[in-house]
Regions:
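Detector for Asparagine
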Residues: 25-27, 79, 100, 138, ...
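Juxtadomain coupling helices with adjacent low-complexity linkers
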Residues: 2-17, 96-143
């Protein structure tokens, strides 16, 4: 996975595509717990302590109102680890009543992971294509000399 990471463009794409289907705010946090994509653009750049819990514990974390009051940058909802090749690369959060979101959470997470995998594969294909072009250019230059 070297050379690939979850970026703000991909995070915002996940948010936009998901929020067209589900009527709730979506946040995407990077591997350091920072919000890098959100339906609430004012939250982008904030540290999300709920995401830090997901990253450190490697599991789904439900946040109710009582917990949200004690954590920084957190609202009631559910937070799920985003995995790529078994490694947690970020967190996806759905804002709202955890009990109501649980049924959507896994589906949203699976869809986001599929988008991440597709992006990673496209990156690898582009890299492979560049390496092939470079090899051909080197062979042509070697023949000219």
């Amino acid at each position: 996975m070297a050379g690939w990471h979850l970026d703000t463009k991909m995070a915002q794409d996940i948010v936009a595509r998901t929020m067209r289907i589900i009527d709730t705010n979506i946040n995407v946090m990077d591997a350091r717990g920072r919000i890098i994509g959100s339906g609430d653009r004012e939250r982008i750049g904030e540290l999300h302590e709920g995401a830090l819990l997901v990253l450190s514990q490697g599991r789904v974390v439900d946040i109710d109102d009582a917990v949200a009051r004690h954590l920084h940058g957190v609202r009631q909802g559910i937070n799920l680890p985003l995995r790529l090749e078994g490694e947690i690369v970020g967190v996806i959060g759905l804002t709202g009543e955890p009990e109501n979101l649980r049924k959507y959470g896994e589906l949203v997470c699976m869809t986001a992971e599929m988008m991440l995998e597709q992006s990673r594969l496209m990156h690898l294909l582009a890299q492979d294509s560049r390496l092939r072009e470079e090899l051909v250019m080197n062979l042509i230059q070697a023949e000219e000399n």
